[in-house]
Amino acid sequence: MASLACCAASVFTVSSLAAVAPAAPVLVPDTLAQRLQPCMACHGPEGRASRDGYLPRIAGKPAAYLYQQLLNFRDGRRSNSAMAGFLAHQRDDYLREMASYFAALDLPYPNPALTTASPAELARGARLAREGDPARRLPACSACHGSALGGTLPAVPGLLGLPRDYLIAQLGAWQTGQRHATAPDCMAELSRRLAPADASAVASWLALQPIPAGLKATVPTATSSTGPALPACGSTGQPPR
């Protein structure tokens, strides 16, 4: 009887120890991709946000552009509390690493979004994007962002594959001074020449465009001297053209 009691006590002791034994540690690889997982919570898997949300795609954008935006969020030129908190204590060299990581991702774009814009509104948006408005000294979007609107090197982003609401919000932020870039702030200057209906039109048209296969930022080409002059852009290091 005593031996049975001893055996029962031993089993109880062993099972109790097993119940409270610490779990084996989970080993997470210390890679840049792993450290940047928090970015995916908002920007989507691998930074390829969908077209029906507010947050932008960051995968495949020019590294110099992404780096400049990370600096802008960290240093207060762009206002977003989540981004500011995430970047507050990050060094410049680490921001460059982050930018290079996302710039190197080559991922497919989602299909074009649906739209409720009228044909007339879309036609107006297409004219602004492709031709600009000389009467208001508005160059075409394609003059800076590339003929295919996929961005130009080293630091001008593409405009395709972005949600309409995000595009409108950014134009509004430039207009009201909520968003800033390194002086001279060309987008602030140009966006203030847009009427609200124009901003809606060009955003609706851009969000509706299909993405050409293999779309990449390109080397900028010389622009025609007959169009509106392009202002200097401090964030891209480009002189007036």
Model-inferred region functions:
Residues 26-76, 80:
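The feature marks the first
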